[in-house]
Regions:
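An internal, D/E-rich "acidic patch" concept
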Residues: 60-118
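Juxtamembrane/transmembrane-helix interface segments of polytopic membrane transporters
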Residues: 19, 23-27, 32, 152, ...
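Short hydrophobic, aromatic-rich alpha-helical segments embedded in or entering the lipid bilayer
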Residues: 46-80, 270-282
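Hydrophobic alpha-helical transmembrane segments of membrane transport/permease proteins
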Residues: 16-67, 163-183
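Hydrophobic alpha-helical transmembrane segments of multi-pass integral membrane proteins
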Residues: 17-22, 65, 107-111, 154-155, ...
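Alpha-helical transmembrane segments of integral membrane proteins
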Residues: 2-3, 95, 99-132, 148, ...
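Membrane-water interface segments at the C-terminal ends of transmembrane alpha-helices
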Residues: 22-29, 59, 74, 138-169, ...
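N-terminal signal-anchor/signal peptide hydrophobic helix marking the start
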Residues: 6-12
Length: 327
């Protein structure tokens, strides 16, 4: 067990270094000028070359790439993620302020899409070729070909603009202080973004689960169970669910990365102040410190999802736990 966790800790550290290096390399080759992006076009045009060079030096733009990365990595080891150029605040504070909104959004969407996708996949697979199966598959194919931002705009126009049931954006009511915001207010603003992110994430889970159910129903032991007189419901409950659970756990934990990517678009559409919106702001402004910090958080979430899948494997299938212990 000690070797197991030590191996994962080493992998996690190497992953963080690799993600940070890739982010620094991409931002360094970006055509966006951080000075121009942060001071504004009008101020940049009227600024002297000496002032531009002074700002570039102040923000570290004149420091060689490897030196900047080494300084950032060294500070990160001491718990300092740097200072955001766009928000003029420590990166850790910016991320902490927005992480709660993003985690609530992604957590709800992850749970809803996982449960709904698993149930629909099992039902469609158990009723293969029937009307329910055709409707579910058509629904999934339609969603799989629908852009997230377009679906978000459609939901926003119907439920917020036309019907007026929900607010058009943000995470709290406009003009209300943070101390006066209730849990009901925050939940009311969270419904539409979470609905959009959940709906777009259902398709892959449904189709994958359906195929696994079909494979199980065509297996020899299911034929034998039916020959003994077991009903369709008994076959699904006692044979399908047990064998479909492990692949479903794998897919759902791997879906964390897609959830985070989808949240970037959803937060932009609904003006929801989360990590996705901050990542877009950092990318357009050349804010390498904030962008690297958000990339590290997202990589940690994906790594945690894979680790969670391994742990759940051991819970669902003791044979996996034994093999991991021997490794």
């Amino acid at each position: 067990m000690t070797k197991y966790f030590a191996r994962h800790i080493v992998r996690f550290v190497l992953l963080m270094l690799a993600v940070g290096l890739v982010v620094f390399a991409l931002v360094s080759t970006s055509p966006i000028d951080p000075v121009q992006a942060n001071v504004g076009q009008a101020a940049y045009v009227n600024m002297s070359e000496a002032k531009r060079a002074q700002l570039a030096s102040y923000w570290g733009g004149d420091v060689p790439f490897w030196e900047r990365f080494a300084n950032w990595a060294g500070a990160l080891l001491h718990g300092d993620m740097g200072t955001s150029l766009r928000f003029n605040a420590p990166v850790s504070e910016v991320i902490a302020h927005r992480a709660a909104n993003s985690l609530a959004l992604m957590g709800i969407a992850w749970l809803v899409s996982g449960v709904l996708g698993f149930v629909l996949g099992v039902v469609a697979g158990a009723r293969r070729g029937g009307a329910v199966d055709r409707v579910v598959r058509g629904y999934c194919f339609l969603l799989a070909s629908t852009p997230t931002f377009w679906l978000g705009l459609l939901i926003l126009m119907i439920f917020a603009v036309q019907l007026g049931w929900f607010p058009i954006g943000f995470s709290v009511p406009i003009g209300v202080s943070a101390a006066d915001v209730t849990l009901a207010d925050a939940a009311h603003h969270l419904v539409l973004p979470a609905l959009t992110l959940s709906v777009t994430g259902v398709a892959n889970i449904v189709l994958h689960t359906r195929e696994k159910v079909v494979d199980v129903l065509e297996s020899d032991y299911v034929r034998f169970a039916r020959a003994r007189g077991e009903s369709d419901l008994s076959v699904v409950l006692h044979h399908c669910l047990r064998n479909v659970a492990l692949p479903a756990v794998t897919l759902q934990c791997a879906f964390i990365s897609e959830i985070f990517g989808g949240s970037v678009l959803v937060e932009q559409v609904f003006s929801y102040p989360g990590l996705g919106q901050a990542a877009v702001t950092a990318g357009l402004g050349g804010d390498v410190a904030l962008l690297a910090g958000i990339a590290l958080v997202s990589a940690a979430l994906v790594f945690g999802g894979n680790l969670l899948a391994n742990i759940l494997y051991g819970v669902l299938d003791p044979r996996m736990r034994v093999s991991e212990g021997r490794a």
